[in-house]
Each structure stands twice: as C-alpha cells, then as structure tokens.
Amino acid sequence: MRKLGLLLMTILLGSFCQAQSRMEAGIFLDSLSISQTSTNNFGLGARFGYRVHHDVMFEGELAYDYGINFDEGYRNITTGNITALERTSIGVTHGLFGPTLERGAGHFHPFATLKAGFVDFRLSPSLLPQSNLASVILGLRTSNVNAALYAAAGISATLGPVGLRLEAGDEIYFNNGARHNLRIAFGPILRF
C-alpha cells in the first residue's frame, strides 16, 4: 500500500511539475492609440498563458489605460456645425483572450496572435446639457463597452525562465463599424 501511494504521488507530482513548465505570466506597459478621439492612452496590464501544444499557447490578458484629456466637439443637430468644445477625459480597460502561435524552443521566440474580447471606455460626464447638441463621439458615450478583435505579432527573448516580450498590433473595436487602433505592449515574462 505504501509503495502504491508513493507511486501515485510521484506520478501526480511529476505531471504537475510538467504542467507548470507550460505556463507563462507577465506584466506589460501598454500604449493604445484610439482612432475616434486621436488620443494615445498608456497603462499597465497583465497576461497569463497556458501552452496546449508545443507551438500554441492560449493567453488571457487585461489592461488598464489611464485617463487622457482631449477636446470633445459637439455638433448642432440641425446645422451640423461644431458649436461647442469641452475638455473630456477618456480611459480604457480592455480584456482579450485567444491563441498565440509561438516557437517554443530557443532564446528568441517570434509569435503571432489573434485574440477576442472587450474594450471598455471610461468617459468623464458631459457638462453640456443642451438638447440641440450631439457629441462627435456619441457612439462611445452611448455604448462604452464594445466587442474587440486583436491581431498582433512580436518577439520574446528568454534566458531560462525569465524574459522580455514586445508586441504590436491592431486592436479593432466595433462601435458603429470597425475602429482600428494601434496597440504596442512591452514587459517582462516568467515561464514556469
């Protein structure tokens, strides 16, 4: 009985340790250029991945971009002319999940990824109560949580279990059509 218990423990711990070498975690600095507001938002994020195949990793990530001020224009709904400007703050939270194709061996790992998720825009409240004005970014004000698709490529360099990762891609959110936005992320990773 004791030998059977030791054998089962060895098998379970061995498979657990093997599974641990298939994971990756990291934090990153994030830059997102929002096309509708022409702002460059910066923030922090974290990512976790699990390797399901030698060259395929499923990753989930969440990033919080701090608020940036910009001038929001308001159009007169009868004439179509911009009649007011207001200083507005916009912040972004985005979460994405999907596969990453990455060469697993060696010290340099080029990769490509396609992820889906959400983009949540945090806009400061509007101070203009006039009923004949409409914001030029009305779609973001009425629907601040939007579906997103992210296609990117990059490279990671590792030395043992630690490394650095750089990626750039197009984060597309859907708000009255597809909106393309450049996104760049850079930060340390840990493989275990």
Name these PLM-found stretches.
Residues 21, 40-44, 91-95, 108, ...:
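Residues that define the transmembrane beta-barrel architecture of outer-membrane proteins
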Residues 49-131, 160-161, 174, 184, ...:
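Gram-negative (and chloroplast) outer-membrane scaffold detector with strong preference
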Residues 31-34, 80-87, 135-141, 171-175:
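Extracellular loop and loop/strand-boundary signature of outer-membrane beta-barrel proteins
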Residues 18-54, 58, 116, 185, ...:
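Short glycine/proline- and aromatic-enriched beta-strand/turn motifs that initiate or cap beta-hairpins
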Residues 2, 175-186:
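Short glycine/proline-enriched turn or capping motifs at secondary-structure junctions
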Residues 121-171:
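A charged, solvent-exposed segment within the mature domains of Sec-exported extracytoplasmic proteins
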Residues 1-22:
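Cleavable N-terminal export/targeting peptides
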Residues 27-31, 60-64, 112-118, 155, ...:
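Transmembrane beta-barrel strands of outer-membrane/channel proteins
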